[in-house]
C-alpha cells in the first residue's frame, strides 16, 4: 500500500478512491488515458481478489510492480525483471485453471513493458519467474521439514534459467486469462 502514493504522483490529478486492508487505490490520468494504481498485498490470493474486483469495475490491463528475489546470478539488486511466464508453484492459480495451463502475460503488454524498459535505459531481464506461496521457505529451506524438496526444486529452477522468485505473477497471469 505504501508504494501507491509514490506511483500515483506520476498521474495527472491523482486522487485516492479507496483504502481497505491491503488495497490502496488511486485514480487519475496519464497522457489522457484513465489509469488506476492499486496495491495487491502479498501473494496470490490477495492479488486474485484485486484483479477480479478491478476487472468487475472495467479494468482491462494490469501491470504489477513489486519486488522479487534473484535466482539467476545475472539478476542484480535494482535490475528490472519482466516476466515472460511463471512457474506455478503456488495454489491460487490452480483455482482458476488446470496446472498444465501456462501462466503467461498478455503479449501486447509484455512487449510494451520491454519497449518501455529499453527506451528508459533500464537494466532489465526477460524470462520465467518462480511463483510460490512461502515468503521465507525457499530462502532458508534448511529449517523446513520439506528442505530436500525445496533445495531440489531451487536447483532445478536455476538450471532451467528461472530469473527470480516472487509470489504474485502466476495468479495475475492466470486470473487475467480466465
Name these PLM-found stretches.
Residues 1-112:
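Metabolite-binding pocket within alpha/beta catalytic cores that recognizes anionic/polar moieties
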Residues 153-178:
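A C-terminal functional module that forms or caps the active site or interfaces directly
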Residues 103-161:
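Active-site rim beta-loop-alpha module in soluble metabolic enzymes
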Residues 74-77, 137-139, 177:
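Short secondary-structure transition/capping segments
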Residues 64, 83, 125-132, 166:
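Short, conserved beta-strand edge motifs with alternating hydrophobic and charged residues
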Residues 9-16, 85, 114-123, 134, ...:
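Generic secondary-structure signature for well-ordered alpha-helical cores
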Amino acid at each position: 500500500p505504501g508504494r501507491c502514493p509514490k506511483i500515483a504522483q506520476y498521474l495527472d490529478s491523482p486522487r485516492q478512491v479507496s483504502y481497505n486492508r491491503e488495497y490502496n487505490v488511486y485514480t487519475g490520468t496519464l497522457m489522457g488515458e484513465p489509469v488506476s494504481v492499486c496495491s495487491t498485498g502479498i501473494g496470490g490470493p490477495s492479488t486474485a481478489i484485486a484483479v477480479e474486483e478491478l476487472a468487475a469495475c472495467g479494468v482491462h490491463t494490469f501491470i504489477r510492480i513489486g519486488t522479487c528475489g534473484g535466482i539467476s546470478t545475472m539478476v542484480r539488486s535494482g535490475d528490472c525483471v519482466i516476466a515472460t511466464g511463471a512457474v506455478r508453484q503456488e495454489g491460487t492459480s490452480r483455482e482458476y485453471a488446470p496446472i498444465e495451463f501456462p501462466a503467461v502475460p498478455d503479449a501486447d503488454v509484455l512487449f510494451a513493458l520491454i519497449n518501455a524498459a529499453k527506451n528508459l535505459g533500464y537494466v532489465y531481464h526477460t524470462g520465467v519467474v518462480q511463483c510460490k506461496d512461502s515468503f521465507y521457505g525457499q530462502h532458508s529451506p534448511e529449517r523446513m521439514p520439506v528442505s530436500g524438496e525445496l533445495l531440489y526444486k531451487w536447483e532445478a529452477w536455476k538450471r532451467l534459467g528461472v530469473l527470480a522468485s516472487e509470489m504474485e505473477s502466476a495468479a495475475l497471469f492466470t486470473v487475467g486469462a480466465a
